[in-house]
Amino acid sequence: VYALDGEVVLPLADLEKIFGVTAVLSEDHTSLRVDASEQALLESGESYYGARDVYWLSHIINAEAGNQPMDGQIAVGNVVLNRVADERFPNSVKEVVFDRRGGVAQFSPTADGRISLTPDEDAELAAKLAFEGYDPVGESLYFINHSACNASWFNSRLTYTATIGDHVFYA
């Protein structure tokens, strides 16, 4: 899985394997025939995460990264999920999103009200992709908008992992 011009792309061979189908490209490369005679039974990813978690994750993604490329939106979701999995942080999506460690909102949209904005379809897709394991930033637990924040504290104390769009990610 990778991103291309802000879109999530999955190689055809992987799709064939996942769905248990065979895809045949026409000789002139203008059409694709899919043989689903041996269709695999896939359980929806939504059976592994709840609507409430998608709700809060898509809201924070929209508020923090709604103007960023899809990889950047997914990466913000990854930071939240990485925190949920890390014993140093709260253990639910909502608790991580609204965490006020040291009396300071860990995600500014919870302090300024942007968390209440309705997420668009991209933010919801990014949340679901993050839940389903697409992860462009590895073990990142923090991110900043480098155009709106001085990175010196982050650079001196944390390990840089990636830059996507306007955000710099750290572990």
List each model region and its residues.
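Bacterial extracytoplasmic/cell-wall-associated proteins, especially those involved in peptidoglycan
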Residues: E43-A171
